[in-house]
């Protein structure tokens, strides 16, 4: 294998990928945008469904597989979104800390499995004069994209979207998209989370066909004035080919328009609104407003966008966490995107089940362990009312295995302090913020999980501060420098330690990003923890580990089903049943322990 390839170089984070932006779907009219049903937009085309699929354990790609005339008669059909292991290609592997491949960064084994995808799509004639973008919301593995036989681009980072402009690669009528997914890459070393190792295109794939003049990004900063009474909205819209166009802004409270205005289109349009006596967003009162932005050319609407926003202000002062001037406590959980039958694919009914259960259990906060969750999950948190600690797709826990196995205090490899990996770290943080910044539910950003601490975290912190100064930043690994975390963040402290910290004069709030491990008969001591949390203002709460068991539903020869865990598929190395350690069973049936969580 060529060890100088794109997927074994951490300084190559992408090739010809579009800059990160918010999740935004275009519509032809404001009435369409109001319904918020993207499937009915003439500017949207889903590529979910059956794709032609080829898998190679050795990473062998048939020559010319991306070509229009290549024969796929001996290929299989695979549903997208999906993880190929869940359809019998390769096996699921569960490991918590130990890397699934030998630690030799940035290199990966020569026998690196590859999954090849092909699908035809029809480009409507109405799209021929506009711009066309191809979007992948999540691909586990480093991947190349081809359209009609030509290479379009390349991307990494499993839980972040990748968008490519394909205007110059497509034509009216039938077109071919092909995707080449490499299971392991240098990115594997930064995605060592405690979960099943699964591969492939596991989130939505779709096309956007928009007018030449259109909104590329729409950032809405909705905060409060110093009295916490009036809303202050700053909108920044990036417009492609803005010449001669106008933007019309309308802010709705339900059906009532509370503000309307207009501005000439520019490359970036900044628009500010003050909303008297605004309805504020909190987890208990998730009031939202609809921001409608229409692009007008010649007085006619050519594109309509709509963003749901919430007015709130997050502050750290007096050693406490405040939302809208009120000190709050976070009764949280850690949540993975997981499904017992589909792996990392999360159907809407599963997401709804999660949010409804959380509200019933008096959960008010979710840490997206340990990567940005499906964007639809954040929509539900906005709507139902859950505070979110949004976490960068970053963990390199296995780099310290030498310390645990030999007693050596050093690490096998210091990713977080290595300049060669700085770009990859910052790329992950930047893309998270750029995707999720409009969600009112997000009250803190996280620099990742169990990745120790180094200058790369300081660079992440600085970049997030540039992009969004309105929210605090959390990182548990910054234990000594205190440069990259606005709260003291800890894991699994004893109750006595928590009480001692409550009495400390440290100026930062104290947050347990993981505590009360729920495995077996856990979680324990929740009543004692919460007696301390309520007593001491500095203690702002924590997130129980974890929300739902990761057991995989398996059918036996007798027709019975059971939940499999690490090692049940012959996967090595594995961490056994450590993936079934939550408040709920894999099918979301609550464990008996949820009573302790609800009543704490």
Stretches found by the model and what they are:
Residues 145-147, 230-263, 269-271, 291:
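Beta-strand-rich binding/interaction modules
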Residues 2-6, 11-14, 37-38, 52-56, ...:
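Accessory beta-strand-rich segments of carbohydrate-active enzymes
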Residues 178-180, 290-294:
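Extracellular recognition modules
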Residues 212-242, 588-600:
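Surface beta-strand/loop "capping" patches
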Residues 127-130, 170-174, 275-288:
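Short glycine/proline/serine/threonine-rich loop/turn segments at secondary-structure transition edges
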